[in-house]
Structures are given as structure tokens and as C-alpha cells.
Amino acid sequence: MSRISKEEMSKLLSVYFIMGSNNCTKDPLQVLREALEGGITIFQFREKGEGALTGEERICFAKELQAICKEYGVPFIVNDDVELALELDADGVHVGQDDEGITSVREKMGDKIVGVSTHTIEEARWAIENGADYLGVGPIFPTSTKKDTKAVQGTKGLAHFREQGITIPIVGIGGISIENTASVIEAGADGVSVISAISLAESSYESTKKLVEEVSRSL
């Protein structure tokens, strides 16, 4: 197996759904199915925060979600936990600046997908040099889902990455909704990552479809 190509990675980032059990008011397995039916291109398992599952329960839940992603042929990424990603033979892992270092993550993950959250050009360059396949840039807009977020960057912050010669695939993160998706893509992102825009939507299927339409219209 060889590392994913830039072109392929860029396409996969289009509509990036991130979810854990505590992000849903409905059955999370149903929410994921609806999102997959609606057209998400990649999924990240992020079981964190208040009311999150732990231990064996967390592993079993991750396996259920992974099995559903496999049915649809959509990559299953694990947030932060490299050991869990390896145990599940996930398609990849996404790490933040405070998690395990990118060099060690790349070494352990081999040719699997490695995504890194970055907030500055320096962090972005370091991640690229050490094997990141894509960057998560944000928060673009204020978000209530993550409590430990950095300062809001706005679409200008995202555009700055492109102006500084960062050409690696980028997914916009933070406070993204159907209404502001176009501005994120126009600023230079290859795709948008969302939690509540899908997980808390009245119809996760309809919401995903609209996000997919917005992204394709803006690319």
C-alpha cells in the first residue's frame, strides 16, 4: 500500500462528518447511516467530552460505526487515539497539536491517512514535513461543540494558508453550517468538516445532501 495521493485526499475531504455518541439526540448509528446515504465522503469517530463512552463500550461503539462506513465504502478515521486506530485497523487518524507528535503518529500508522489540526503557518509546515496527508484548519467560525478551541480564524485565516503557499489538502473546521459552507470553499478549503450541522439536524440525510450540493457548487 502506498500513501494516498493529494488528488484523492482532496476529494475525500469534501463533506467530512465528525461524530461521537454524545453529539446526537437520536440513535447515532441511524444518524451515521443517514449521513452516508446523503453523501458524506469521510467519517471521523470522536468520542470525547461530557457523557462520552469509555473502555470496552467505546471500542464496541467504534466498531459498529466502522462497519457501517465499510458498507458504504467511506473511510473511517479515529480522532486522536492512534492505538485505537491500529486496533480497529481504521483507515486513518486525526491528531491535534496537543496529541501525540506527528512524526511518531506517521511511523505507527504506516501508509494510512494522517490528518493534523493546525492554527498557524508554522504548525502547517511542520505537519507537512513530517507526513500529514491533510490539514484541519480552524476554527473558522465560533463553535459550541468543542470547549477547548483556539481563537476563531475566519475565512481570512484559511485564505492566508493558501496565500503562504500551503498546497496540501485542507478541510475547514469549526462552526460550519449549510449557510456558510460556500465561503469556506471559496477561501481555499477542499472540503468542510461538521458535527452538529449533521448530527443535530432534523433530517441528517437532508442536511448532508445540502452540504454536498453547497460544496460541489463552490468548488
UniProtKB/Swiss-Prot annotation:
Gene Ontology molecular function terms on file: magnesium ion binding; thiamine-phosphate diphosphorylase activity
GO cellular component, one term: cytoplasm
InterPro entries in UniProt: Aldolase_TIM (IPR013785), ThiamineP_synth_sf (IPR036206), ThiamineP_synth_TenI (IPR022998), TMP_synthase (IPR034291)
Binding site for 4-amino-2-methyl-5-(diphosphooxymethyl)pyrimidine: Q44, F45, R46, E47, K48, N79, S117, K146
Highest rank taxon of the organism: Bacteria
EC numbers on record: 2.5.1.3
One Pfam family hit: TMP-TENI
Binding site for Mg(2+): D80, D99
Class of enzymatic activity (EC top level): transferase
Cofactor(s) in the UniProt record: Mg(2+)
List of residues binding 2-[(2R,5Z)-2-carboxy-4-methylthiazol-5(2H)-ylidene]ethyl phosphate: T143, S144, T145, G175, I195, S196
Co-factor binding comment: Binds 1 Mg(2+) ion per subunit.
Keywords: Magnesium, Metal-binding, Thiamine biosynthesis, Transferase
Swiss-Prot/TrEMBL catalytic activity: 2-[(2R,5Z)-2-carboxy-4-methylthiazol-5(2H)-ylidene]ethyl phosphate + 4-amino-2-methyl-5-(diphosphooxymethyl)pyrimidine + 2 H(+) = thiamine phosphate + CO2 + diphosphate; 2-(2-carboxy-4-methylthiazol-5-yl)ethyl phosphate + 4-amino-2-methyl-5-(diphosphooxymethyl)pyrimidine + 2 H(+) = thiamine phosphate + CO2 + diphosphate; 4-methyl-5-(2-phosphooxyethyl)-thiazole + 4-amino-2-methyl-5-(diphosphooxymethyl)pyrimidine + H(+) = thiamine phosphate + diphosphate
One GO biological process term: thiamine diphosphate biosynthetic process
Pathway of action: Cofactor biosynthesis; thiamine diphosphate biosynthesis; thiamine phosphate from 4-amino-2-methyl-5-diphosphomethylpyrimidine and 4-methyl-5-(2-phosphoethyl)-thiazole: step 1/1
Family listed: Belongs to the thiamine-phosphate synthase family.
HAMAP family: TMP_synthase
Function: Condenses 4-methyl-5-(beta-hydroxyethyl)thiazole monophosphate (THZ-P) and 2-methyl-4-amino-5-hydroxymethyl pyrimidine pyrophosphate (HMP-PP) to form thiamine monophosphate (TMP).
UniProt protein name: Thiamine-phosphate synthase
Native source organism of the sequence: Bacillus cereus (strain 03BB102)
Gene: thiE
